[in-house]
């Protein structure tokens, strides 16, 4: 990464590319016990959060990610009541989950409290649900939390993590997925951010392989635009305990949802279930 001439530029080595934002000033910086968190004011994208020099979110486009890691899984499950979010310290995913009135509890477990405190200060619009009676915010190791989660107690596990390095490295392996598998009920769904399908299909395949080793039987990777991330195209991957799951969703409920979204719709959900040919071929779909 580099900062020069009022631009913040993140270099992405796997594709020999970069993404940049014009900035008007640095608002804050905190070194937590786990990582460095920085907040910048941009000229066109609102506020920008970096973690260890990598772009995490902007005010302008975070809705793509937060909606797609939440609503497809919640509308795919027949009746989700208990949701666990591992990571998600900016609280945007928690906000989207708790838009669903049928959800009775949502526990967010992020290892770094400072991410949440910075989000509350600089991205308060993401933290609307933090004081919802159904919300529980924990600041602990997500790997340990899932290992100790009672068997068959959770409907959906959302892994809203940073890239598979540093504090998030343990969230991308068989042992962690085994804990998720154990905690989920029979109709439960695991959903995890799965990087760029344009640049990192090998990593997505590795994730799905590790999930399969842990017992998951069916997988579906959903691509979506994410302008602030490398390549501008991102994905989430859903995993089911059920063999040959088709990931059909409650289309009527999605069409009649009683809350606003900026990107997710029932029609979009239908379309995103059909992977582009090069993605389908690489993932064996």
Curated annotation (Swiss-Prot):
Spermidine binds at residues 66, 90, 160-163. Transmembrane segments: none annotated. Belongs to the spermidine/spermine synthase family. GO terms for cellular component: cytosol. GO terms for molecular function: spermidine synthase activity. S-methyl-5'-thioadenosine binds at residues 35, 110, 141-142, 167. Pathway: Amine and polyamine biosynthesis; spermidine biosynthesis; spermidine from putrescine: step 1/1. Its EC number is 2.5.1.16. PANTHER family: SPERMIDINE SYNTHASE, SPERMIDINE/SPERMINE SYNTHASE. It is found in: Cytoplasm. Its main location: cytoplasm. Catalyzes the irreversible transfer of a propylamine group from the amino donor S-adenosylmethioninamine (decarboxy-AdoMet) to putrescine (1,4-diaminobutane) to yield spermidine. One of its GO terms (biological process) is spermidine biosynthetic process. The keyword Transferase applies. The keyword Cell division does not apply. Residues 5-241 form the PABS domain. Gene3D superfamilies: Spermidine synthase, tetramerisation domain (2.30.140.10), Vaccinia Virus protein VP39 (3.40.50.150). InterPro entries: PABS (IPR030374), PABS_CS (IPR030373), SAM-dependent_MTases_sf (IPR029063), Spermi_synthase (IPR001045), Spermidine_synt_N (IPR035246), Spermidine_synt_N_sf (IPR037163). This is Polyamine aminopropyltransferase. It catalyses: S-adenosyl 3-(methylsulfanyl)propylamine + putrescine = S-methyl-5'-thioadenosine + spermidine + H(+). The gene is speE.
């Amino acid at each position: 990464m580099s900062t020069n001439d009022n631009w913040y530029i993140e270099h992405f080595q796997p594709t020999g590319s970069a993404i940049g934002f014009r900035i008007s000033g640095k608002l804050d910086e905190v070194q937590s016990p786990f990582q460095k968190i920085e907040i910048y004011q941009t000229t066109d994208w609102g506020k920008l959060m970096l973690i260890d020099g990598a772009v995490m979110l902007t005010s302008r486009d975070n809705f793509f990610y937060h909606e797609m890691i939440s609503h497809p899984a919640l509308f795919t499950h027949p009746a989700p009541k208990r949701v666990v979010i591992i990571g998600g310290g900016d609280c945007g995913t928690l906000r989207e989950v708790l838009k669903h009135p049928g959800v009775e509890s949502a526990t967010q477990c992020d290892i770094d409290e400072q991410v949440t405190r910075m989000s509350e200060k600089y991205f308060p619009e993401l933290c609307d649900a933090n004081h919802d009676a159904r919300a529980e915010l924990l600041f602990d190791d997500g790997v340990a939390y899932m290992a100790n989660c009672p068997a068959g107690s959770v409907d959906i596990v959302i892994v809203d993590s940073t890239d598979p390095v540093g504090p998030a490295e343990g969230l991308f392996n068989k042992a962690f997925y085994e804990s998720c598998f154990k905690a989920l009920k029979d109709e439960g769904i695991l959903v995890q951010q799965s990087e760029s399908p344009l640049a990192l299909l090998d990593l997505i395949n590795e994730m799905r392989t590790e999930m399969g080793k842990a017992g998951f039987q069916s997988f579906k990777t959903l691509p979506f635009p994410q302008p602030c991330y490398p390549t501008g195209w991102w994905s989430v991957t859903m995993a089911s305990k059920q063999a040959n799951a088709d990931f059909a969703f409650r289309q009527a409920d999605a069409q009649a949802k009683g809350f606003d979204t900026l990107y997710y719709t029932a029609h979009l959900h239908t379309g995103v279930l059909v992977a582009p040919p090069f993605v389908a071929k690489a993932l064996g779909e």
